[in-house]
């Protein structure tokens, strides 16, 4: 079957729309599917995602589409950009409609709820082994990407040709630099753990701690990410790149980050429900914290920052008490395995 579009993007939120804008601005006919027909109709009429990216026009090569079958028939390249807790559901809806030559890439950051499984495991469970898989990850705020500001990401996958094709599709000399990476596991994990550490950074700043504490938290958060990554077969070097250190620094230090703002609100005294309402969009790190905590416990990996964030979010611990417990931990060598 011939493509009538170069790529189909599933998920018309802020990040899905931003990636679709970048692809279309790069000269690629791009279908953007969303599950709410009214939202898609608004995109068509407004030529803009007024709800999530107001003021940024949609390129002519970006075609909003509310019918999933039509969207999936248009291209064999499918980019999934939905929250991690609905990733499996969206894939299950898509499965009977996928072309036989379909290739699936996702920009979803997180793990499977409750189990802490990697997104690749969810994809394989739903789709089987028939389709090439890939993931893109890195330090990206949707608004900046959509506005054409310089951005860099990494891509890894199960099929070298698919990875190479994605680099060609996404890379733009003017707006988006794309690095190929061979660590499929590491790229998936980085996007989940950084959300947890970003909440921790927000908590720290919300309490009133300064730049010293935030920097220490980011640094030790990177250690936790690397420790967990190595335990599941990732390469430590990956976490010094875009999907590790890059995403971690971005998300922990800039208030465009929902996870950081969520932590700030909690640190200033809001409860979890009020903080989520204040943000007004999905805070991936809330669920990611439980997912990462579950995975770390299952593997016996020590992640003290993650554990304290988990206790604040799910066990009612005060941010101040969590900070005190981190500071009063047993003295250790910086380079120890714990």
From Swiss-Prot:
GO terms for cellular component: cytosol. It comes from the Bacteria. It is found in: Cytoplasm. Signal peptide: none annotated. GO terms for molecular function: glycerol-3-phosphate dehydrogenase [NAD(P)+] activity; NAD binding. Pathway: Membrane lipid metabolism; glycerophospholipid metabolism. Its main location: cytoplasm. Keywords: Cytoplasm, Lipid biosynthesis, Lipid metabolism, NAD, NADP, Nucleotide-binding, Oxidoreductase, Phospholipid biosynthesis, Phospholipid metabolism. Sn-glycerol 3-phosphate binds at residues 109, 138, 140, 194, 247, 257-259. It catalyses: sn-glycerol 3-phosphate + NAD(+) = dihydroxyacetone phosphate + NADH + H(+); sn-glycerol 3-phosphate + NADP(+) = dihydroxyacetone phosphate + NADPH + H(+). The active site is at residue 194. Catalyzes the reduction of the glycolytic intermediate dihydroxyacetone phosphate (DHAP) to sn-glycerol 3-phosphate (G3P), the key precursor for phospholipid synthesis. This is Glycerol-3-phosphate dehydrogenase [NAD(P)+].
């Amino acid at each position: 079957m011939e493509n009538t579009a170069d790529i189909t993007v599933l998920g018309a939120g802020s990040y899905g729309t931003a990636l679709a804008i970048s692809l279309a601005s790069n000269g690629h006919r791009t279908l953007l599917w969303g599950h709410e027909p009214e939202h898609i109709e608004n995109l068509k009429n407004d030529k803009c995602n007024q709800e999530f990216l107001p003021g940024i026009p949609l390129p002519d090569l970006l075609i909003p589409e509310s019918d999933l079958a039509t969207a999936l028939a248009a291209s064999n390249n499918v980019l999934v950009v939905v929250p991690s807790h609905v990733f499996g559901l969206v894939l299950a809806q898509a499965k009977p409609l996928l072309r036989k030559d379909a290739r699936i890439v996702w920009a979803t950051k997180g793990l499977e709820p409750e189990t802490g499984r990697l997104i690749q495991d969810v994809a394989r469970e739903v789709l089987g082994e028939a389709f090439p898989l890939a993931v893109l990850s890195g330090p990206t705020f949707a608004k900046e990407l959509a506005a054409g500001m310089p951005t860099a990401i990494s891509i890894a996958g199960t099929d070298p040709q698919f990875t190479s094709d994605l680099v060609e599709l996404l890379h733009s000399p003017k707006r988006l630099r794309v690095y190929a990476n061979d660590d499929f596991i590491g790229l998936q994990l980085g996007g989940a753990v950084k959300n947890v550490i970003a909440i921790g950074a927000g908590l720290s700043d919300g309490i009133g701690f300064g730049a010293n504490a935030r920097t220490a938290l980011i640094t030790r958060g990177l250690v936790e990410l690397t420790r967990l990554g190595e335990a599941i077969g990732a390469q430590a070097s990956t976490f010094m790149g875009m999907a590790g250190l890059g995403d971690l620094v971005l998300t922990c230090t800039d208030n465009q980050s929902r996870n950081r703002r969520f932590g700030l609100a909690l640190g200033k005294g809001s409860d979890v429900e009020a903080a989520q309402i204040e943000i007004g969009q999905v805070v991936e790190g809330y669920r990611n914290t439980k997912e990462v905590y579950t995975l770390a416990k299952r593997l016996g990996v020590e992640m003290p920052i993650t554990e304290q964030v988990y206790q604040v979010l799910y066990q009612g611990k005060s941010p101040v008490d969590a900070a005190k417990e981190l500071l009063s931990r047993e003295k250790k060598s910086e380079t120890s395995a714990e």
